[in-house]
Amino acid sequence: HSLPTVESGALAQIQYTGGTTGTPKGVMLTHRNVVVNTMQGRFWCSNFREGNEVFLGAVPFFHCYGLNTCQNLAVATGSLIILLPRFHAEEAVKAIQRHRVTIMSGVPMMFSMMIDCPKVDRYDLHSIRVCLCGASPLPAEVQQAFERMTGVVISEGYGLTEAGPTTHCNPIQGAHPPGSMGLPFPDTEARIVDLETRIRDV
């Protein structure tokens, strides 16, 4: 069967979000938005091994963060995704040990719940090579405790649904200053403005 022709500017998905206003709205993302953000993530995660990574699919895929940084990035690298219908800390650590998970995308609460899991010491989590965190700020104490527990530094990032979603991330290898949202993704322009939208110096 021949595949249909798809224009890069055509609508690919509608992501619903409350955004910064709290008023629900559907963000229209094109095929270009989705593919480019996935490729930016692939470039950023240059230490990913094509066809040899195992992702923990614990973040919901109906959310732009889960869809792009877990599902799409896994598909782009030919990786296996271990799906969890809903997040439960002990089920997550069991899955990491059983399937030798190497990549985990999560939100701060997930990492915190894993740290606080009463049975976490029973499981070997050292297969994890990369942890990505988004959706809300990562507390420094959670970052430090998770690193002590697994030996892996969480790479915190920033994005918004309207951007498709990721715009910034800390380097996968290198400095991870606590509280930093990282550096702009490739070909991403960033600026600081005040409430009157005047550009400010960095």
Where do the language-model regions lie?
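Conserved adenylate-forming
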Residues: S2-G9, I14-G57, T77-S79, R122
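Short Gly/Pro-enriched turn/cap motifs at secondary-structure boundaries
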Residues: T5-V6, I172, G179-F185
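Conserved S/T- and glycine-rich ATP-binding loop of Class I adenylate-forming
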Residues: L11, T17-T20, F55, F61, ...
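Conserved AMP-binding/adenylation subdomain of ANL enzymes
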Residues: V35-V54, F62-I103, C117
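Conserved AMP-binding
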Residues: A58-H63, S136
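Gly/Ser/Thr-rich phosphate-binding loop
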Residues: A76, V93, V101-G106, I115-H176, ...
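Alpha-helix capping/helix-boundary segments
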Residues: H88, M109-F111, L138
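Conserved beta-loop-beta connector loops within the AMP-binding
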Residues: R191-V202
